[in-house]
């Protein structure tokens, strides 16, 4: 099986701190006949190594992390209901349109403004992360990868939980932008803490 793997787990020094995060359990899969394809969305997106750490920062109105993918390709973990400001009259926005009428027209804009990937200095790195996610997804698909083992908790690669955007070490349910893109494209995603026993025998 061809497996896309976060390059830092394979020993490549591409993390934000300029180091690697080698995982022997992941590396041993190659000895069991699996072909490991290294990926690093941050580097593919043009970010330097080392770099200022980043986290996904969400607006208060962010929706469910399990919401379906948006039509414009926004990863499903980032889709949300639009934020609407009330004019005090039930069912209407401040512009006089009903909530139901304004929902569809504002949904796409909400997807764009309800989240961002910021570094610890406040700089917006969303474009680089999105660019890298799509580049590595394309490479994984071209290689025929059926599975991705991606670094836990990362704003690119986390699957199931990520840091909450406060740079305090707090975790919240969610997906990294690349992990969500892989998942939405039909590539199964796990992290390095998963049980590889069954996979090792495949």
Residues covered by each model-derived region:
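Short catalytic/ligand-binding loop motif for oxyanion handling, primarily in non-cytosolic enzymes
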Residues: 13, 47-48, 156-159
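Divalent-metal-activated hydrolytic enzyme cores
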Residues: 32, 42-44, 72, 115-139, ...
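Short N-terminal binding/cap micro-motifs at the start of the first secondary-structure element
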Residues: 11-18
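Short hydrophobic alpha-helical segments enriched in small aliphatic residues
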Residues: 72-73, 84, 88, 96
